[in-house]
Amino acid sequence: MYHIILAFITAFLLTYLAIPSIISVAKKKKLFDEPSDRKSHIVSTPSLGGIGIFAGTIFSVILWTPFNFFGDLQYILCAFIIIFLIGAKDDIDPISPMKKFIGELVAAGILVFKANIRLTSLYGILGIYEIPGWASITLSIFTILVIINSFNLIDGINGLSASIGSLIAITLGVWFLMIDRIEIAILAFATAGSTIAFLKYNITPAKIFMGDTGSLLLGSVCSILAILFIELHNIIGDSPYAFKAAPSVAFGILILPLFDTLRVFITRVFQGRSPFHPDRQHIHHLLIDSGLTHMQATFMLLVVNCFFIFIVVKLQNIGTLNLLILILGIAAILSTILLFIASNKKKYKEVRS
């Protein structure tokens, strides 16, 4: 237990102390995220906060993970280094989406093939239980890539990605602690510690953004935690801490980044545009357009994510597929209401102007 507390504190302190120096260097070198029509900030802001998150997380994990628990952690750290390099390069000198995707694919491949972060069962969704080897590899890599990029996509307003990432890491970290998987819990709480420290500098008015360096790392950590959460239910059996619908519970815990990505991609396709074409259709953009401030929108979405965690924990007994349909339905209704409010607010502003 003390390893986990120390991992959190170490990551928090290192990131908290490192961020001011990162801000200073970014300003001297003019490494800013510039405002644009698609972005929600209006002043040039340093965007290398992810360096502090990475440093705090990795240092703390290496320092406090007991050697006998180290396991496949070396491969996970290798994947994180690749993700860090991709993010840092993109924050300093933007790279093409294809190059970024290839880098993410390499990192995902390391996690699946070397660290064995792999989905092997759908727990009865659509009647599917055990997944064949090739399908398991494909699904696992796809899941990792989706979660990584979903965090990148929600990193659009102050505090959002860091708040949601911290919530997910702590929620899953507590579960890993309860089933005595100390090494995974340390990773979760170290990530939460560094991310919460970063939040101090990211609340409005934001002194720094996490950039791709931070959002891609957060997505990587959460993808690992989510897949291991699902997979370890094959091992813990009738443990009092086992959930009846693990895949749906995991989806509910990650509901905000996953559903927002799914909703935006579907919307773009129906509008005849590429699903990767950037716009202001994300849930956080709709909240801002409806009149909320950055921190109000972030707090609201954090509460909504907590609500979904409560729902999936309480209703886990209704079955994996039923629970998945329920949370998708609730999320769809809530986002439709929000879209309606934002649309009316926008029309009202246009009429007044």
Residue ranges with predicted function:
Residues 30, 91-93, 122-131, 292, ...:
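Membrane interface segments of multi-pass transport proteins and intramembrane proteases
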Residues 59-71, 89-95, 112-126, 232-236:
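Transmembrane alpha-helix boundary signature
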Residues 34-46, 207:
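Juxtamembrane helix-capping/reentrant segments at transmembrane boundaries
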Residues 1-30, 54-82, 161-290, 294-353:
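Alpha-helical transmembrane segments
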Residues 76-106:
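Hydrophobic alpha-helical hairpins/lids featuring a short glycine-rich hinge
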Residues 81-85, 103, 107-118, 139-149, ...:
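Membrane-embedded alpha-helical core segments of multi-pass
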